[in-house]
Amino acid sequence: MPAVDIPGSKSVTARALFLAAAADGVTTLVRPLRSDDTEGFAEGLARLGYRVGRTPDTWQVDGRPQGPALPEAEVYCRDGATTARFLPTLAAAGHGSYRFDASEQMRRRPLAPLTRALRDLGVDLRHEAAEGHHPLRIEAAGVEGGEVTLDAGQSSQYLTALLLLGPLTRKGLRIRVTDLVSAPYVEITIAMMRSFGVEVAREGEVFVVPAGGYRATTYAVEPDASTASYFFAAAAVTGREVTVPGLGRGALQGDLGFVDVLRRMGAEVEIADDGTTVRGTGSLRGLTVAMRDISDTMPTLAAIAPFAEGPVRIEDVANTRVKECDRLDACAENLRRLGIEVATGEDWIEIRPGTPAPAEIKTFGDHRIVMSFAVTGLRTPGISFDDPGCVKKTFPGFHEAFGELAAGWGIPLTPSR
């Protein structure tokens, strides 16, 4: 059976870099993701004075529980949301003056709930242009800790940032969450903090994080489940079979739950200890599914929805409107370009069955739009992309890996460029 080697998880790599930088000692990360986002995170750590050593398969980070080594720094976060949200939080635990900026795309993405919570904890933080957006400056003097209330209804990354900060504060944190999206990503954070020596307690909607810092370790990064979704969907939509090694029972990432959606649609799914296999059965059923907890895979499902035998309705995904682009509108626009009937609302999209026609996909610079509609291209020769290279954000080698899988199945692909 074809097996695809999926690069390391972006979300796990970003958290691991934060934890390694904050830990006491030298941490080795095994098989981290090397992409524009994670390289930007590592570059940001270096700008703050952390030492990050790299070999082809590992990164070593010299931790500094006391915070950044440099008293002043300017950090450019590129397009990375984790970089733009986690690094200012890490810097706040230190002592110095730190300025953060990001790409135009990232400047448009919201930050206000996190920066409001940091200010409530006493952090001297100032937005230099639009309130709640980059660029921003932090005059760091450590964080005392205590109680704080957070709205994480737009992004679970706000909560993750505060959870990661907790052990670096003097008193620990008690975080009351009023709303939470993509909850499985928070479970990733808590599990990884445990690997670095910190146990988070949850009391309903309150998360209690002790002070005391992190201890260095060797940490293996599992394959990216969001990236794997394109290959699983490819098998389901073509009636073929694919296995992703290293992503099986016990995986941290909630986005592996996408295979349960494929199972509901009629695909055969086998989750073993050491990997996951999806087999297409030649047909896909329509369905209605809430994807709030696995919303990064919403475009994957939208891209294969026309091939289902009935309508596909995806609900509870309002947060996808504030990603790299408005993904609900981007999916709808591109499906219409392909001749597919689509309806959308504030937090939903409904896609009717149809036969997509060749067209150029408008990517909006969003890696997930490209990778999702590449799956559509397996059944629709002639699909192309206005910016195929934006996949470098999470999987620089995507087109080659996807083309190799398709060739192994005997399916010719239109060149992406």
Tell what function each PLM region has.
Residues 1-417:
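Short, structured segments at the rim of ligand-binding sites
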